[in-house]
Regions:
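Conserved acetyl-CoA pyrophosphate-binding loop and the N-cap/start of the following alpha-helix
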Residues: 103, 107-115
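Short strand-connecting beta-turns/loops that link adjacent beta-strands
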Residues: 17-18, 72-75, 87-89
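Conserved N-terminal entry element of GNAT/NAT acetyltransferase domains
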Residues: 1-18, 35
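Hydrophobic pocket/interface hotspot
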Residues: 23-24
Length: 129
């Protein structure tokens, strides 16, 4: 699996420590999410999420992808926490997916998820959670 193929519409890359301010900015704009799913985001919570894995996957950090989806202007439009081969070998888990507030409601998130599903189906994945 190659995560750069997760989207045909956006550039996908792994997010790293230096991206935390960018991720934090995107997340902080989505206050309604954190009203329903506290606590509110912090740089430390993002840092923790970037490496968090379910207990069964602790020995397989290579299956963890904390991804950014960028438009042609290199603006971050979405963040995704993706775990490969979980909970089964032919499935994957999206632990977190958040869109830039200013582009919500235009079908971009649906397009990203649809493109991801098409790609994973082409690889034989049976289930996406």
């Amino acid at each position: 699996m190659n995560y750069i193929n997760f989207s045909k519409s956006y550039h996908v890359r792994m997010l790293i420590e230096r991206d935390i301010p960018l991720i934090l900015s995107l997340c902080e704009k989505n206050t309604q999410f954190y009203e329903h799913c506290p606590p509110f985001v912090t740089a430390e919570s993002i840092r923790d999420d970037m490496c968090a894995l379910p207990q069964r996957k602790m020995d397989e950090p290579q299956d963890k992808y904390y991804l950014g989806f960028f438009d042609d202007a290199e603006q971050l439009v979405a963040v995704m926490d993706f775990i490969d081969h979980y909970p089964t070998e032919q499935s994957c888990f999206i632990g977190f997916f958040m869109m830039e507030r200013s582009v919500q409601g235009h079908g971009i998130g649906s397009r990203i998820i649809t493109e991801l599903c098409v790609y994973l189906h082409s690889l034989g994945y049976e289930y996406i959670r």
